[in-house]
Amino acid sequence: MTRGRLLLDLLTRGRTFSYGPDRSQRADLRVPPGEGPHPVMVFIHGGSWRSGQGRIVMRGLVGDLLRRGWSCWNIEYRRVGNGGGWPATFEDVAAAIDHLPRLDAPLDLSRVSVLGHSAGGHLALWAACRDRLRGGGPGSEREGPRVRIRQAIAQAGVYELAGAYRLWGGGAVAALMGGGPEELPERYAVGDPLGLVPPSMPVLLVHGTLDQTVSVRFSRGYQRAVNASGGEAELVEIDGPAGSHRSHIDPRGAAWAAVTTRLRGARAPVAPEPVS
């Protein structure tokens, strides 16, 4: 396929690329009109790190951000039940982000952001702190990540795995990590976002105060830890039904409006104008 045909394909309906041999090691790329290069948002879906939910749930947000002038990289990854868990899930998220320079598309790799919902929020903040690993743990590189993330956005996520393990009696966290923090402290040390603070970029947390799936306490605790350690984390709390767990992936909702407001704001490192 010629470069011109590829770009036309990306503009009209996007394309799916493989970043590894497994069928879950795929991602969809959408690029807005215009010469570019365009800022990039990496989307990471949730679903308790299990195989029952896939990247399709993020397509509404992808479509909205595409219209606002962003290139969108909506990733899939191996999850518990289809070859994922420790360390594969973490390795896949890192590999998907590091695959961006290999794409023949007008992407501005100096302006890459990451956004995740629920379990994807955990993975987004973990990916944002990969530069702190430096050769230790999945997804680490001795010279640092190939792609530098400029800002991280996490929606209703789990940012303290050890605390979630205790709160939920193991559950999804135990399935992801292969056990608890007392028996596997080395895994939690490199897989738990709370242990990797402060991130080197600004973080936006959005969470509903009445979320019955993932308590807002996780966002509050993470924000306190980041800011206390010299980092920058902002928390937007959504009250009432507008802050339910799944409302975050509705592009018409208040939770998503908080994200797009941040992306337009002066504090954001990237603020493209909406595409008419």
For every predicted segment, state its role:
Residues 33-37, 41-64:
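Short, surface-exposed "cap/lid" segments of acyl-processing enzymes
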Residues 6-12, 162-195:
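Mobile cap/lid helix-loop segments that gate and shape the active-site cleft of serine hydrolases
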Residues 205-207, 211:
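Short beta-strand/loop motif that positions the catalytic acidic residue
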Residues 220-276:
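C-terminal catalytic histidine-bearing segment of alpha/beta-hydrolase fold enzymes
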